[in-house]
């Protein structure tokens, strides 16, 4: 139980850290992104970059949670659901600032991407075991 809680909390922290680092990269590397961020007036390319950022953060969170939880395959799913519950209110607040497809892509892929990150780690671990 303690290991599952640690795995879930760490997965959530990893999501925030990865997203923050990648967002910093977007600010530094994508022309106009830093200026567009305060008003959320992103171009299509910027919106796609933000969705990709979220996907990488979700994959990392799932892999981290799975690595720590090991024998509890439900933990990454719990992490994904917690993230979804945390993000829905924020997306409702900014609903008018983004097209519907943006919100739907982010919210509907959040839980599956966390689970997929966990599955990728499990698959990699299974193939790395000596025969």
Language model feature labels by segment:
Residues 1-131:
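Juxtamembrane/disordered regions of integral membrane proteins
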């Amino acid at each position: 139980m303690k290991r599952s809680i640690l795995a879930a909390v760490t997965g959530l922290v990893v999501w925030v850290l990865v997203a923050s680092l990648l967002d910093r990269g977007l600010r530094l590397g994508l022309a106009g992104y830093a200026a567009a961020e305060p008003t959320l007036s992103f171009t299509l390319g910027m919106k796609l970059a933000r969705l990709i950022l979220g996907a990488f953060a979700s994959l990392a969170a799932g892999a981290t949670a799975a690595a720590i939880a090991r024998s509890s395959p439900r933990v990454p799913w719990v992490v994904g659901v917690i993230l979804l519950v945390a993000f829905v209110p924020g997306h409702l607040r900014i609903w008018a600032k983004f097209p519907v497809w943006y919100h739907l892509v982010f919210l509907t892929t959040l839980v599956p991407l966390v689970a997929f990150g966990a599955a990728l780690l499990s698959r990699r671990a299974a193939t790395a075991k000596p025969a």
